């Protein structure tokens, strides 16, 4: 596997690992490298179905030569890596709650085609099934205890074509962006989806939007809460997330990150289009249930 090969290369003292693939491949490689004290640099040539991580790093997607040229600029950043229960690692997002659990009923072929969250555009009918549950969430600034329908712990701003779920997320600040969704009301959820496209959800009354270097999520009921880590099943809560600050040195498009805008190649619009379609279908559902 990519994880085993990355671990072997790291142990052998290689200076550089080049990951050619999508988010899943990068996750495996980072997971292979992360347990070691001395780690090689990482370069990415995005060739996968979903390339959210490359999007966050402003690396040209579906253009291997452009990605190689970017690597040649020799711009690197020591990025944060998430760790789950001192075991698994993730590079983009961890999530839990009702929506996460319902997504496991969506056929895997759709997940393969659209990536985590983006493929939910094909499953907007899941929204009426979302339910809240009581949890205790411990973070750097205190404790939240109450009912939530879902939560997200994000390392980057880009998730499945939704580029403003965590609009102020930074790659190297040592902090997760923690988002707690406090409603299961269909109309309020539909409104939130529209807000996510614009990034205006962060101030909504149904959202707790926080920054934290560590997060612990504990269910306060007997109902199981499944965790999703970078789009894959990551066990059940209680769960602790730890931010490994500046853990991997990676080649990035530093000019674009500093300018805070996206490359916008025409071939790279697919996920944005899916995200927009999700919002449109949500609006349509909102009209139908009135």
Predicted regions: what is each one?
Residues 166-173:
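Active-site loop ensemble at the mouth of alpha/beta enzyme cores that anchors a bound cofactor
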Residues 35-153:
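Catalytic core of DAGKc-family lipid kinases
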Residues 148, 235-240:
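Short, solvent-exposed S/T- and G/P-enriched segments that are highly enriched in secreted/extracellular
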Residues 246:
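Catalytic core of tubulin tyrosine ligase-like
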Residues 95, 99, 152-165, 233:
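Glycine-rich phosphate/pyrophosphate-binding beta-alpha loops
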Residues 123-135, 173-176, 180-224, 282-286:
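Catalytic phosphate-donor-binding core of small-molecule kinases
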Residues 1-43, 65-75:
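N-terminal glycine-/serine-/threonine-rich phosphate-binding loop
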Residues 1-17, 27, 257, 268-277, ...:
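ATP/NTP phosphate-donor binding region
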């Amino acid at each position: 596997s990519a994880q085993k090969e990355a671990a072997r290369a790291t142990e052998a003292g290689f200076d550089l690992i080049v990951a050619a693939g999508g988010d899943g491949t990068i996750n495996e490689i980072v997971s292979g490298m992360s347990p070691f004290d001395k780690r090689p640099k990482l370069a990415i040539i995005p060739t996968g179905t979903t390339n959210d991580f490359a999007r966050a790093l402003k690396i040209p997607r579906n253009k291997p030569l452009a990605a190689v040229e970017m690597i040649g600029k020799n711009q690197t950043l020591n990025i944060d890596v998430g760790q789950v229960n001192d075991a698994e690692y993730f590079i983009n997002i961890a999530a839990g709650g009702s929506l996460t659990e319902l997504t496991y009923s969506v056929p895997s072929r759709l997940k393969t085609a659209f990536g985590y969250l983006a493929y939910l555009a094909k499953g907007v009918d899941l929204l009426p099934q979302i339910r809240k549950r009581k949890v205790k969430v411990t973070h750097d600034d205190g404790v939240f205890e109450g009912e939530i329908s879902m939560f997200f712990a994000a390392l980057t701003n880009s998730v499945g074509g939704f580029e403003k779920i965590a609009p102020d997320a930074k790659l190297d600040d040592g902090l997760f962006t923690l988002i707690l969704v406090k409603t299961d009301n269909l109309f309020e959820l539909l409104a939130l989806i529209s807000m996510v496209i614009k990034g205006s959800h962060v101030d909504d009354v149904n959202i707790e939007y926080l920054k934290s270097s560590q997060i612990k999520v504990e269910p306060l009921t007997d109902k199981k809460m499944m965790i999703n880590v970078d789009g894959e099943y990551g066990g059940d809560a209680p769960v602790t997330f730890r931010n490994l600050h500046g853990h991997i040195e990676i080649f990035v498009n530093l000019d674009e990150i500093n300018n805070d805008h996206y490359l916008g190649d025409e071939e790279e619009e697919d996920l944005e289009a899916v995200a927009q379609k999700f919002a449109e279908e949500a609006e349509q559902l909102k009209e139908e249930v009135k």
